[in-house]
């Protein structure tokens, strides 16, 4: 162990070199801080073992020498540019780990208590994989001790012996590759997506810085080895994994374009699976991280510590897939920027991952009540300003006297507020009843029931107010109201409460003046007073119900029905008398008329030009035919002579009638003549009626 310290120096010297490297490169310190989250999640036992392995095992650069010279001497890949990129990638990773070791040393004392529990689990995990690594580790330690000496001595001059040593080391690594792969598949590979992305980003940033100092490169390689050893797994697994990655990088340099495409496809599928896994793990991150969250300073550390709590199977599967993805990214020349861009597009920035859980899902602070709008109830509510309007109101002082009484006037008393004027005075009102201001029915009495006042002049000519009412207070304390000739008893009673006030009206407002404490009531003094009598009469009239339906006795027949019958008989008698008078008048007029005229016999053929004796009347023919038939019917009767005489008389009357009608037609004109002809035909059809009328007339004349 003394030889190892002489070769590599003590831990204090390594820490001093780390500080110098930190001050030398400021840009590398930022990614180093990001990667320190996973180092803090490791256990103290791992750190102890890492210190031992760091003292025993050499760094990658000491084993293999400079990558650029290795590529030139070995002729495995045949391309100098690819080896230079792999060298730059490893150099960048080493520079990143330099800062991580410093942060781990600072936080080592604070995280010892938290890593004790994880130490037991890591020891159990390392025990499962110790057997397959024992042989490889033994051979590696023996070979590495010699190689480190050669690497330290030949680093300054870059001699050919270093290339030969590198070739021998490569052969040893090829022999141990199968064993390392088997141990890697059985063990756990706790690598996080954030570290891989940081490694890819650091590769781009450090491509221009590949000519840094050899001393810093060796220190960076040691820090890189410690970075992988600080993870919550065994040191042998991480060292073997590092060596296997270097060997695979050399093999991938010689692969063709088809191999690079296949590795890119596998990397894309692995990234998709990891993305789904990270989305499912975001929900349980707060519960699983627990104590680790308190030691992290930013959101990226939270995501890395959350990855350390995953199950063993998921971590192992992710480590194998990410190893392939990282190898393909380091080997590819043109596809490396595109792969980094795809990874950043898939996973995003670490700040974006934790921003949603920190800000959006943060519960409200207890003890602060919130209202429906999300505002604190403790905040004072804004009160609306009061609107004040200054108004000047004159103060009214009234002389209310010594005593103030509240009076509710009964219905038999009333007060006239206006002064009495004989010119407009009305003794009695037309309406017997009226409604007061309160809607009660009030009796309209005469002067003795209305309190009035007036203004008159005294002997000196001064105005004096008189009233027809006064209150008299007797020696026993009782009072009475004298209103004209009527006397009313006055009763005093106290008022309960301050609910009755005296106000003075001013425009639309009221101004209070006093508070009533006593009330007065009035009653008639005796039942003999006029007020009492009139009041009782009004009550009697109000109580007596008027009978709206009258019942009359039915003696004999209904006089209305008899009256209607008598009116009908009287009308019939008048019509009969009028008819007789008209018939008698006609008979008298016909006696003075002449014989028949041809003008009226033919009303249908009447024409002024065709007037003459040659025209024949149809009515005359009909009468002639009827007369002959009646004569034949009377042959067998015993009264044939009498009938013949009657027929002669009728024919004469008819002829006279026709003559009179004809003369009237000449006077009235053509239109009136046609109307009369129609009336004559109607009369001819009513011949028996004419006979009856004529018989009656003859009987009356005989009488």
From Swiss-Prot:
Residues 23-42 have a biased composition (Low complexity). Residues 53-64, 105-116, 123-188, 197-317, 557-572, 578-592 have a biased composition (Basic and acidic residues). Residues 74-92 have a biased composition (Polar residues). Residues 242-279 form a coiled coil. Residues 1-15, 370-384, 661-670, 694-703 have a biased composition (Acidic residues). GO terms for molecular function: RNA polymerase II C-terminal domain phosphoserine binding. This is RNA polymerase-associated protein LEO1. InterPro entries: Leo1. Keywords: Activator, Coiled coil, Nucleus, Transcription, Transcription regulation. GO terms for cellular component: Cdc73/Paf1 complex; nucleus. It is found in: Nucleus. GO terms for biological process: positive regulation of transcription elongation by RNA polymerase II; transcription elongation by RNA polymerase II. Its main location: nucleus. The keyword Coiled coil applies. Pfam families: Leo1. Component of the PAF1 complex (PAF1C) which has multiple functions during transcription by RNA polymerase II. PAF1C associates with RNA polymerase II, is involved in transcriptional elongation and in histone modifications including methylation on histone H3 'Lys-4' (H3K4me3). It comes from the Eukaryota. It comes from Xenopus laevis (African clawed frog). Residues 1-391, 553-572, 578-613, 627-703 are annotated as: Disordered. Belongs to the LEO1 family. Component of the PAF1 complex, which at least consists of cdc73, paf1, leo1, ctr9 and rtf1. The PAF1 complex interacts with PHF5A.
């Amino acid at each position: 162990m003394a030889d190892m310290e002489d070769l590599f120096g003590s831990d204090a010297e390594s820490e001093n070199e780390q500080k110098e490297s930190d001050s030398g490169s400021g840009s590398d310190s930022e990614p180093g801080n990001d990667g320190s989250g996973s180092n803090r999640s490791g256990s103290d036992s791992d750190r102890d073992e890492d210190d031992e392995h760091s003292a025993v095992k050499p760094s990658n650069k000491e084993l293999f020498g400079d990558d650029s010279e290795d590529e030139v001497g070995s002729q495995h890949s045949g391309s100098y540019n690819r080896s230079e990129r792999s060298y730059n990638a490893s150099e960048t990773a080493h520079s990143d780990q330099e800062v991580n070791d410093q942060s781990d040393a600072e936080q080592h004392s604070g995280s010892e208590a938290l890593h004790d529990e994880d130490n037991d689990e890591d020891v159990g995990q390392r025990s499962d994989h110790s057997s397959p690594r024992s042989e490889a580790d033994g051979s590696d330690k023996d070979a590495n001790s010699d190689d480190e000496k050669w690497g330290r001595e030949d680093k300054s001059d870059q001699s050919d012996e270093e290339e030969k040593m590198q070739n021998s080391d490569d052969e040893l690594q090829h022999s141990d590759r199968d064993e390392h792969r088997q141990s890697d598949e059985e063990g756990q590979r706790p690598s996080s997506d954030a570290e891989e992305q940081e490694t890819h980003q650091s590769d781009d940033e450090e491509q221009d810085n590949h000519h840094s100092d050899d001393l810093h490169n060796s220190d960076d390689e040691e820090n890189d080895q410690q970075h992988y050893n600080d993870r919550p797994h065994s040191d042998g697994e991480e060292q073997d994994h590092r060596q296997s990655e270097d060997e695979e990088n050399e093999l991938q340099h010689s692969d063709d374009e088809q191999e690079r495409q296949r590795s890119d496809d596998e990397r894309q599928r692995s990234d998709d699976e990891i993305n789904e896994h990270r989305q499912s793990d975001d929900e349980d991150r707060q519960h699983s991280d627990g104590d680790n969250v308190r030691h992290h300073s930013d959101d990226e550390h939270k995501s890395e510590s959350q990855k350390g709590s995953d199950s063993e199977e998921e971590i192992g599967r992710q480590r194998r897939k990410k190893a392939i993805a990282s190898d393909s990214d380091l080997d590819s020349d043109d596809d490396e920027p595109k792969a980094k861009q795809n990874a950043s597009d898939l996973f995003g920035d670490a700040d974006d991952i934790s921003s949603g859980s920190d800000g959006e899902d943060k519960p409200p602070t207890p003890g602060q009540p919130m209202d429906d709008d999300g505002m604190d109830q403790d905040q004072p509510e804004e009160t609306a300003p009061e609107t004040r309007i200054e108004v000047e109101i004159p103060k009214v002082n009234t002389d209310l006297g010594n005593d103030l009484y509240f009076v509710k006037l009964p219905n038999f008393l009333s007060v006239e507020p206006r002064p009495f004027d004989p010119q407009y005075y009305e003794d009695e009102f037309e309406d017997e009843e009226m409604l007061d201001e309160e809607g009660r029915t009030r009796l309209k009495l005469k002067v003795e029931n209305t309190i009035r006042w007036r203004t008159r002049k005294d002997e000196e000519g001064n105005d004096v107010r008189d009233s027809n009412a006064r209150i008299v207070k007797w020696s026993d304390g009782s009072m009475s109201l004298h209103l004209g000739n009527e006397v009313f008893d006055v009763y005093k009673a106290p008022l309960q409460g301050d609910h009755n006030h005296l106000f003075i009206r001013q425009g639309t407002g009221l101004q209070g003046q006093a508070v009533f404490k006593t009330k007065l009531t009035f009653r008639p003094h005796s039942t003999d007073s006029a007020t009492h009598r009139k009041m009782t009469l009004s009550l009697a009239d109000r109580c007596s119900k008027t009978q709206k339906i009258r019942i009359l006795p039915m003696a004999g027949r209904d006089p209305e029905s008899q009256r209607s019958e008598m009116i009908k008989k009287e009308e019939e008698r008048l019509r009969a008398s009028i008819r007789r008078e008209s018939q008698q008048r006609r008979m008298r007029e016909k006696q003075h008329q002449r014989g028949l005229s041809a003008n009226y016999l033919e009303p249908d053929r009447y024409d002024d030009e065709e007037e003459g004796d040659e025209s024949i009347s149809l009515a005359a023919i009909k009468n002639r035919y009827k007369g002959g038939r009646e004569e034949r019917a009377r042959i067998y009767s015993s009264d044939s002579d009498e009938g013949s005489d009657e027929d002669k008389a009728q024919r004469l009357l008819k002829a006279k009638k026709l003559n009179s009608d004809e003369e009237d037609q000449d006077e009235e004109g053509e239109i009136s003549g046609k109307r009369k002809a129609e009336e004559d035909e109607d009369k001819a059809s009513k011949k028996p009626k004419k006979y009856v009328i004529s018989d009656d007339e003859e009987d009356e004349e005989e009488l």
